A protein has these predicted regions:
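Residues at or immediately preceding the N-termini of alpha-helices
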Residues: 36, 69-71, 85
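GIY-YIG nuclease catalytic motif and its immediate N-terminal context
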Residues: 1-48, 54-64, 75-78, 91-108
Length: 108
């Protein structure tokens, strides 16, 4: 019974879809997470040196969107990943025209 309640509670957890970029805004990464600040810190700290984000110095959080359910965030991640580079650029630019690192603006 406890395990079932734990799984049910986790399924109701919210989540975030996010886009990160390198300093010159020539490489991006789209991801999804339940804990945005922790995940962004992992990218910035390059905890996996062989990863795409570490290899291309993708350390700036330039876009994020929160959802009440992690499944919604996953669906949005898939939608964004299916976009062309130009459409991703327009998505970020609409909310963050200067492509600044907005990590300090995150409210979880």
């Amino acid at each position: 019974m406890t395990i079932y309640l734990f799984l049910t509670d986790r399924m109701k957890r919210g989540g975030y879809v996010y886009i990160m970029s390198n300093p010159k805004n020539t490489a991006t990464y789209v991801g999804v997470t339940a804990s945005l600040l922790i995940r962004v810190s992992q990218h910035k700290d390059k905890i996996n040196p062989d990863s795409h984000t570490a290899k291309y110095n993708i350390t700036k959080l330039v876009y994020y969107q929160g959802f009440h359910h992690i499944e919604e965030a996953i669906a949005e991640e898939k939608r964004i990943k299916g976009m062309s580079r130009k459409k991703k650029h327009l998505l970020v630019s609409a909310l963050n025209p200067e492509w600044k690192d907005i990590t300090d603006d995150v409210i979880e």
